[in-house]
Amino acid sequence: MQIREVFDRKRFVFLDGGMGTQLQARGLQPGQKPELAALEMPEVLTAIHTDYANAGADILLANTFGANAKKLTGCGHTVEEVVSASIACARKAAETTGACVALDIGPLGELLVPAGTLAFEDAYKEFAQVIRAGAAAGADLVFLETMTDLYELKAAILAARENCDLPVFTSMSFESRGRTFTGCTVESYAVTAAGLGADAVGINCSLGPKEILPFAQRLCRSVPAGVPVFVKPNAGLPNPDGSYNLDPDEFAAEMKEYAAIGVSMVGGCCGTTPAFIARLHETFSPLTPADKIPIRRSCLCTPVRFVEVNGITVVGERINPTGKKRLLQALRDGDSAYPCTQAVAQAEAGAQVLDVNAGLPGIDEAATLEQLVKDLQAVTDLPLQLDSSNPEALSRALRIYNGKPIVNSVNGEPETLEKILPLCKKYGAAVVGLALDKGGIPPTADGRFAIAQRIVDAANAAGIPNEDIYIDCLTLTASAQQEGAVQTLEALSRCKRELGVRTVLGVSNISFGLPCRGYLNTTFLTMAMSAGLDLAIMNPNTPEMMAAVRAYRVLTSQDLQSTDYVAAYADVQIQTTQTSKSAATVAEVGAAAPGGDALFEAVRRGLKAEARAAADAALTMREPLDVVNVSLIPALDAVGDGFEKGTVFLPQLLQAATAAQAAFEAIKAKIAASGQAQGSKGKIVIATVKGDVHDIGKNIVRVILENYGYDVLDLGRDVDPERVVEAVRQTGAKLVGLSALMTTTVPNMQATIEALHAAHLDCKVMVGGAVLTPDYARDIGADYYCKDAKASADLAKQLLG
């Protein structure tokens, strides 16, 4: 098959099946690195590829899933050696059938900043090394799979796009709730990957065909028509013994439903064999892929928050130094705490997007905007509007933004369009176009519309579709140009109606220089919404403005069943009082009663600097133990409960833990200064078992347990059973946590548990990892199965107090 045939949709394209379980079944020993099979057992590896090719696979994934520098450390071989040998084995198998060979790339095994410690550009470099090696070895395409972190996937896509000219396939793994391990939604994945230039997108691993089907349907609706969608499910769900519950016939029968939803490529993942692919080939070969009918929608996103701009959407304006002395000083000082608190406050007030501006004389705008984006991504899940016309600043901010942002802005000047539109296209961003050019802002609606038309034409020519274009017809001050308001709204309405684009306005400019600005702002906002305004850049902390937005959504059926309106105002009482300046003002009582515990709130919101300051303040009035028990632990419990319910996601959980850690440092310092002994709730030993180099989950468990006051000894990854036994013996730990991600390393987990039992140590063992289930944990001798960090903390509290 020629690689171009993959995209013509004339027939179904067949991907191969599981590799790790096949290697294990054909002689791979526990602890042996699967990625070295091409060097240590090449005949076996080639035979597996050959079996898949003979079963009908059009694309063979080379055995390079973990062939990166981090995972190959200490193995005695370079990335280039492993990748080249692996590609050669797949290529040899493909000779007889003409199958394509894919450079298979999985996650690096570490969380990226801010959730972890791996820098974005460091992840990029790791992926780039593998991709250059794969391209040099003759791979036909790059296959990025089993990703759970959208930020890591972005680094990998950019590495592929910038280091080779091969097609790029991307795939993420979703849990049963419809989100990845880090909380990413299907829609956020789809628009981000497609926007970055993925040639095909898909879903693999974690679940079986029946469970993945609804997520694949959402994926087909969310990617552009020209981007193929593929699926590689597991062979059903895992059994207690580590096998899977579907045979080839059952698997193919469940997979057949995908033929009707727009998927055009099918294969298998864990537990599937050449027999599964052969049965898939028999089932799908007579069929033709159904047309994929995506929904063309305007949207912005972060991994966990997908904002569809289908009606009035609020953009918080407060992270802009213009007229804001405190923010101005914070930016000059490099102080991220204040803008972060502004972000959190605006989100809680109802903003759906946050404008971020670092344009300030005397500072490095590019460096400042980049750092602002990094800091804000750590504390808020709202999409960002990158407010700059500086190409360097935008390039740096767009590169490290996690999701799909909007750029504010370009204008009718050719130079601006030529420099900024390509950046928006490369990074998959939406763009705001200001209806002005070198002649300034036209006084008439016709003049502004003409500029808007030029901007839309230029954006389309750059490959940016209308749904990603937002026109700002510009709000002029009523005090100076009173007739301008009508011209602005007329131009806005024409752009929406005739150009088929979205619209945006900075609402509060209308009232500058006039008294009682809130009246003018609210009235103009209502007029603009009626004219078709989509993005309102405004202060969401103004109750009257937000009330107008929420009421408008109810009356135009954007807020179905008035859900948001009722949630905001069910407990609000209205007080009308006379003032000397106006007939009446409206005060909202009880709408946002502030919590009395600043430390609790800072930890809950994940604000590190505020948590430290609040802890310092609390310690002047309260005993350290009281601060821990009354403020810190309840805050962590609240965030953990949200995580359990699916309202809080992994990044927020880790940010709360980081904030709590900052507070704990203050508490430890206070205890040390008083000469008191620091207490511990108990000692826990944790490790990733021998042969397994994946330690993301284990690291998260460590952070959470430490913040609950436990003394945690982390032995790291690829840990021998003997080291675990010795650590428990030396520390007297009463609880041991073992982690394994791969089916091939679960036997080593069992061996470690058996070694602990043989040593007659007085400890309990909890286990966790993607391949484990409660039944499987019991079968290998574990005392407890913990599905996540919150479950581990709950168990520790139960056992150790």
Describe each model-derived feature in a short phrase.
Residues 1-801:
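Domain-level signal for soluble alpha/beta catalytic cores
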